[in-house]
UniProtKB/Swiss-Prot annotation:
The keyword Disulfide bond does not apply. CDD domains: ProRS_anticodon_short, ProRS_core_prok. It is found in: Cytoplasm. Belongs to the class-II aminoacyl-tRNA synthetase family. ProS type 2 subfamily. This is Proline--tRNA ligase. Homodimer. Keywords: Aminoacyl-tRNA synthetase, ATP-binding, Cytoplasm, Ligase, Nucleotide-binding, Protein biosynthesis. Gene3D superfamilies: Anticodon-binding domain (3.40.50.800), Bira Bifunctional Protein, Domain 2 (3.30.930.10). Its EC number is 6.1.1.15. GO terms for molecular function: ATP binding; proline-tRNA ligase activity. Catalyzes the attachment of proline to tRNA(Pro) in a two-step reaction: proline is first activated by ATP to form Pro-AMP and then transferred to the acceptor end of tRNA(Pro).
Amino acid sequence: MLLSKYFLPILKEEPSEAKVISHKLMLRSGMIMKQAAGLYTWLPLGLKVLKNIENVVRSNMNKVGALEVLMPCIQPAHLWIESGRFEHYGKEMLKFQDRHDNTLLFGPTNEDMITDIFRRNIKSYKDLPKNLYHIQWKFRDEIRPRFGVMRGREFLMKDAYSFDINQKNAVNTYNKMYKAYMNTFRDLGVFAIPVIADNGPIGGNLSHEFHIVAETGESTIYYDKRFKILKDNPDIDVEEIKGWYAAAEEKHDVNKLSSFPEGITRSKGIEVGHIFYIGSKYSVNMNALINDEYGKLIPVEMSSYGIGISRLAAAIIEANCDKKGIIWPCSVAPFKVSLINLNIHDNKCVELAAKTDKELSHQNIEVLYDDTDARPGSKFATHDLIGSPYQIIIGPKKAANNIVELKDRKTGVLEDIEVENIINYIKNIDSI
């Protein structure tokens, strides 16, 4: 992709309304543009990141046998009335009437609708288990939307819902999804801690939140240092992991502790996922019954699994940035390589840049080729800001000797490489 043809509205000045680093960098790098309080347009660069996060999430859901569906963002209110949740959400839920005076709502979540889909189609234990997920925009009318897409009113979520014959099987499915979430965050290039949580308005009695560790996080979390090994070893047995949590009754006032218990780490975290074992709350309220092996009608056991995809875009930035800008993990980067031609009037620079761009593209490595006439300092600032994991820099002096520079955005290390070797060099970088 030629930068001269791309739509990248870079902001030179730091936006005054932005309070957290992710919001500042998303606005400055041309990822998003504010339309109203808590509402943003995702511009080309930001949308590429969003799609890449979606693909990582989708891949891990498919690996555990979850099936993708797409439910409407507008839901009939009668389902929420039937489940008993219609009044609970209060003013956060956007409600309205259609021309026939039917009450509708912009869905903040989908437990009620997925239960309706299940009860109308599945009647026997022989059709279980089932695990359905969708990726859809949601709306909650936050009283004080803030922090950009981190706490917006409109947001993109992945919601999954599992259905099992009994509690034992439901917990087994829950554990598989727990591991799928750990794999997802590993593939996204972030370190996430699973925290025992309250089920809140969803209901149920087993729940975990997943927090990305970031210095700018809103939440303070305390966790066993053994959780750090999950980043590279996500296949550890879930039952073993459960032994790392404190007992439910083991609570401490951190202000009264003279020192932390041995092996406990304190960090800031950003919640990006939440999973719940719901049980039969919705199936009882909405009459989602199945015939068991003895022909008896019983309520199906359910669990719910959410990941905030648009929130993840901001959280990943919070955990991967420096004073110059974003440092994208390769798996979600909008472009894997920034190809920077320092002199578009030098024939050798143009020749090497065009050749490198073509060959990288043939290897399905996404490249943003800076063919603009901007000054070198301006080009470096732009590409450090947008955060491509690698920069290939082509200047007249080294180009004359068929040499290009490769910069690792994360480490800042520069390396001279002969141009005929650059493609293989890039291909051999594991994270690309």
